[in-house]
Design a protein with these regions (language model features):
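Short, charged, surface-exposed interaction patches
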Residues: 3-166
Length: 166
């Protein structure tokens, strides 16, 4: 049998649609991420860093006592800055040094979140830069959202096909 070429005019005249859809799922978080830290100030840079290290070691020990695993505690920032006084009509005067150390913590047991925050503050943390809630493994939720998007897209495509008589 010979194959026939499709009618070019029919192809050109056929309506085309560009459709998009999205899918969304809502799932309760199963973990939290907190950034917390210690800021110290001393007369010398070495003293500021030593005080900071000692205080941060206490914070990390408190986290470990709360059941936070070592893999869930990560240094996320370390700063050392000179601190100056600026008297009026005079040259700036060095007051000392400020050391700051931040760690990012993953709390996988949300029932322990409040106790963990209390423990780091009691151990000497004087900076808490926010809490973010999330999923330890978001793949299943992402796949569920993708399925919902595909279903929505199929429904839209069928609606357009029916409306145009295709």
């Amino acid at each position: 049998q010979a194959q026939t070429m499709p009618d070019i005019q029919a192809l050109v005249a056929a309506p085309t649609f560009s459709l998009s859809a999205s899918g969304e799922v809502r799932i309760a978080p199963d973990m939290a991420t907190i950034t917390t830290g210690v800021q110290t100030q001393a007369a010398t840079a070495q003293e500021a860093m030593a005080q900071n290290r000692a205080q941060m070691n206490q914070v990390i020990a408190a986290l470990r006592r709360q059941g936070i695993e070592e893999r869930d505690i990560q240094t996320s920032g370390l700063n050392l800055n000179a601190v100056y006084d600026y008297p009026q009509n005079e040259q700036p005067r060095l007051r000392g040094y400020q050391a700051s150390n931040q760690v990012t913590i993953r709390v996988r047991d949300l029932d322990n979140l409040g106790r963990s925050i209390d423990a780091v503050v009691a151990a000497g943390a004087n900076q808490i830069n926010g809490i973010a809630f999330g999923l330890s493994d978001p793949r299943a939720a992402e796949d569920q959202a993708r399925r919902a998007a595909v279903q929505a897209l199929q429904a839209k495509a069928q609606l357009y096909a029916d409306a145009t008589g295709l």
